[in-house]
From Swiss-Prot:
Major location (coarse): cytoplasm
GO terms of molecular function: ATP binding; CMP kinase activity; dCMP kinase activity
Enzyme type, top EC level: transferase
Kinase in keyword set: yes
Protein name (record): Cytidylate kinase
Species of the source: Methanococcus maripaludis (strain C6 / ATCC BAA-1332)
Residues where ATP binds: G7, L8, P9, G10, T11, G12, T13, T14, T15
Disulphide connectivity of cysteines: none
Length: 178
């Protein structure tokens, strides 16, 4: 089974992916972790690396390559803002494609708690990062990140806790056509 989970920072994609991975024994591949690792390898902050990635398409190409390679082996949770799009462009059909969304201030608070940062600083970074990524996705892939038409399920994650979001997805998996 291949499941893609996408969402902007702070929507709960990583938490949800981990819960699903544990429940179904699926490998968890996260584009964000790949991106963060690459930033660390180059001794850059996420903001610096996002700016670098805007003009260096090899960053996205490497992340994409790793995601497609993982998906070709099957049985995984593929987490990333473009995970669903990358598989679609590679003609790999996931069993379930999910997008999590949440109110921007809810996301900002979650990020500030996760990163142990002041809310105002977290908001500034979040806005900058998302603008950078939106521009990059449009230029490199001709993808509008706000286009949710490829997803089977879109969940407003600020309405439920992590277990509530997990339960919704679990029911969807149980009811997938064989």
């Amino acid at each position: 089974m291949i499941i893609t989970i996408g969402g902007l920072p702070g929507t709960g994609t990583t938490t949800t992916s981990k819960l699903l991975s544990e429940k179904y024994g699926l490998n968890h591949v996260c584009a964000g972790f790949i991106f963060r690792d690459m930033a660390k390898e180059m001794n850059m902050t996420l903001q610096e690396f996002s700016s670098y990635a805007e003009t260096n398409t090899e960053v996205d190409n490497e992340i994409d390559r790793r995601q497609v390679e993982a998906a070709q082996s099957g049985d995984l949770i593929l987490e990333g803002r473009l995970a669903g799009w990358i598989l679609k462009k590679s003609n790999i059909k996931p069993d379930l494609s999910i997008w999590l969304k949440a109110d921007p201030m809810v996301r900002c608070i979650r990020i500030s708690e996760r990163e142990n940062e002041n809310v105002d600083l977290a908001l500034e970074k979040m806005i900058s990062r998302e603008a950078s990524e939106k521009k990059r996705y449009k230029e490199i892939y001709n993808i509008e990140i706000d286009d949710l038409s490829i997803y089977d399920i879109v969940i407003e994650s600020s309405k439920w806790d992590a277990n509530g979001v997990f339960n919704i997805i679990e029911k969807a998996i149980e009811n997938l056509k064989a």
